[in-house]
């Protein structure tokens, strides 16, 4: 469902898929080849939310902002199931693991993997190519080439999968 709010209207490239029970509110931009899965909520009622080309937001995730804290998801990013993103920036080609929480003004670099249930605190900067686990999240090493390829394959799966869903769910 798409909802306008206070003259803020979601912008949809039209070349993507939004599950019938996902909720997109206000100042949200969906670039092409994105997918927003079941029960996800993207609430752009305070600041802008941008979902970059080729990215996916999986089931039950919540994306929100605060004043002065817009939310940007880069290109080809996987936001796993039940993730909470709040007023943060996610770099291109990154994977945010199941149940992770990333808070205001945190900045996740490109090609990062944020492990399941990780907590990235406010204002935390995660360098490019980092593998982060724990609560609070800590960089434990660089992402390997094999892991980078696996992230790409996961993202590609969701880019292909939404096209199947768009033809079978009405």
Residue ranges of each PLM-predicted region?
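C-terminal structural segments of small proteins and small subunits
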Residues: 151-154
């Amino acid at each position: 469902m798409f909802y306008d709010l206070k003259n803020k209207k979601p912008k949809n490239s039209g070349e993507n898929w939004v599950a019938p029970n996902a909720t997109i509110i206000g100042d949200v931009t969906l670039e092409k080849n994105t997918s927003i899965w079941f029960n996800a909520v993207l609430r752009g009622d305070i600041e802008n939310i941008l979902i970059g080309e080729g990215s996916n937001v999986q089931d039950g995730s919540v994306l929100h902002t605060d004043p002065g804290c817009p939310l940007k998801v880069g290109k080809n990013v996987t936001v796993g199931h039940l993730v909470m993103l709040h007023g943060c920036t996610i770099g291109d080609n990154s994977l945010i693991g199941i149940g992770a929480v990333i808070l205001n003004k945190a900045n996740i670099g490109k090609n990062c993997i944020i492990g399941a249930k990780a907590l990235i605190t406010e204002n935390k900067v995660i360098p490019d190519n980092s593998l982060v686990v724990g609560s609070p999240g800590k960089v434990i090493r660089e992402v390997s080439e094999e892991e980078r390829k696996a992230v790409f394959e996961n993202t590609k799966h969701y880019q292909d999968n939404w096209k199947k869903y768009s033809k079978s769910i009405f």
